[in-house]
From Swiss-Prot:
<feature type="binding site">
    <location>
        <begin position="147"/>
        <end position="150"/>
    </location>
    <ligand>
        <name>ATP</name>
    </ligand>
</feature>
<dbReference type="GO" id="GO:0004592">
    <property type="term" value="F:pantoate-beta-alanine ligase activity"/>
</dbReference>
<dbReference type="GO" id="GO:0015940">
    <property type="term" value="P:pantothenate biosynthetic process"/>
</dbReference>
<feature type="binding site">
    <location>
        <position position="61"/>
    </location>
    <ligand>
        <name>beta-alanine</name>
    </ligand>
</feature>
<comment type="subunit">
    <text>Homodimer.</text>
</comment>
<comment type="similarity">
    <text>Belongs to the pantothenate synthetase family.</text>
</comment>
<comment type="function">
    <text>Catalyzes the condensation of pantoate with beta-alanine in an ATP-dependent reaction via a pantoyl-adenylate intermediate.</text>
</comment>
<keyword id="KW-0067">ATP-binding</keyword>
<keyword id="KW-0547">Nucleotide-binding</keyword>
<protein>
    <recommendedName>
        <fullName>Pantothenate synthetase</fullName>
        <ecNumber>6.3.2.1</ecNumber>
    </recommendedName>
</protein>
<feature type="binding site">
    <location>
        <position position="176"/>
    </location>
    <ligand>
        <name>ATP</name>
    </ligand>
</feature>
<dbReference type="GO" id="GO:0005524">
    <property type="term" value="F:ATP binding"/>
</dbReference>
<dbReference type="Pfam" id="PF02569">
    <property type="entry name" value="Pantoate_ligase"/>
</dbReference>
<comment type="pathway">
    <text>Cofactor biosynthesis; (R)-pantothenate biosynthesis; (R)-pantothenate from (R)-pantoate and beta-alanine: step 1/1.</text>
</comment>
<dbReference type="InterPro" id="IPR042176">
    <property type="entry name" value="Pantoate_ligase_C"/>
</dbReference>
<keyword id="KW-0436">Ligase</keyword>
<dbReference type="InterPro" id="IPR003721">
    <property type="entry name" value="Pantoate_ligase"/>
</dbReference>
Length: 282
């Protein structure tokens, strides 16, 4: 496994791989890797000849007062996890190279970025789509793998790739959870022991909603109340949103069906966590 920091070296490596007839898979990350990231890498390893993991805490997707400066970083540990997952190259560019002096070009997906996290984190998705577009141009992957925990992000990136005629295949992978149900996230490291216990309200709320749906409940109003009651019972929890959307269009629905996305964003103490499920999926 090789660590590459230079954009030019990563591009030339990708060009050489493609010219040799090899397929390239990319797993974009912000580092502080966990088993969720490893599952993406494992899948990429199966599907491609060359596996690249990018590690870049992208400043343009953090807003004022967010956690860019405190976001957890541990490159040495990340290298061990990536190597164990069969990564060939870690691409870890410097922010000053990705956004040099005079940089002024951004990629913006319009409608899909307005609800959910886009409403509470203005500018976030513009930063995400810009950095992902840049990574696609640098790494030139045949496929790129993203986790479904960031469901809106996955939907937005798919839209960007389609709208801009990018040839990269976007692969969405299932959420990886801790043994007690908490969705794996680098931000879980912020949680105190008590907050960590409180954070289970997200997955418990989703389980309750899914159970009621499978028992025949279709009213979004009733299903939302189930989720709200569970989350509001936790002392540390402050709800950002509990929403029911069509999974493909991210438009609100009043009656739930198999393609309804249940999306949650909840602050546990100072830590903002997200989780989701699609009601028709296991």
């Amino acid at each position: 496994m090789k660590l590459i920091e230079s954009i030019e070296e990563m591009q030339s490596t990708a060009i050489n791989a493609r010219q040799a007839g090899k397929t390239v898979a990319l797993v974009p990350t912000m580092g502080y890797l966990h088993a969720g990231h490893a599952s993406l890498m494992d899948e990429g390893r199966k599907r491609a000849d060359i596996l690249v993991a990018s590690i870049f805490v992208n400043p343009t997707q953090f807003g004022a007062g967010e956690d860019f400066n405190t976001y957890p970083r541990d490159l040495e540990k990340d290298k061990l996890i990536a190597k164990a997952a069969g990564v060939d190259y870690i691409f870890a560019p410097k922010a000053s190279d990705m956004y040099p002096t005079g940089y002024q070009t951004y990629v913006n997906v319009e409608k899909l970025t307005r609800p959910l996290c886009g409403a509470s984190r203005p500018g976030h998705f513009r930063g995400v789509t810009t950095v992902v577009a840049k990574l696609f141009n640098i790494v030139m992957p045949h496929l790129a793998l993203f986790g479904k925990k960031d469901f809106q992000q996955l939907t937005v990136i798919r839209r960007m790739a389609a709208d801009l005629n990018m040839t990269v295949q976007i692969v969405g992978m299932p959420i990886v959870r801790e043994s007690d149900g908490l969705a794996m996230s680098s931000r879980n490291a912020y949680l105190s022991q008590a907050e960590r216990q409180s954070a289970l309200c997200l997955s418990l709320a989703l389980q309750s909603v899914r159970g009621a749906f499978r028992s025949g409940e279709r009213s979004v109003e009733a299903l939302r109340k189930l989720a709200l009651d569970i989350i509001n019972a936790e002392a540390f929890a402050v709800i950002d949103y509990v929403e029911f959307y069509h999974e493909a269009t991210l438009t609100e629905v009043e009656q739930a069906d198999d393609r309804t996305l249940v999306a949650l964003a909840v602050k546990i103490g100072k830590t903002r966590l997200i989780d989701n499920c699609v009601l028709g999926e296991d």
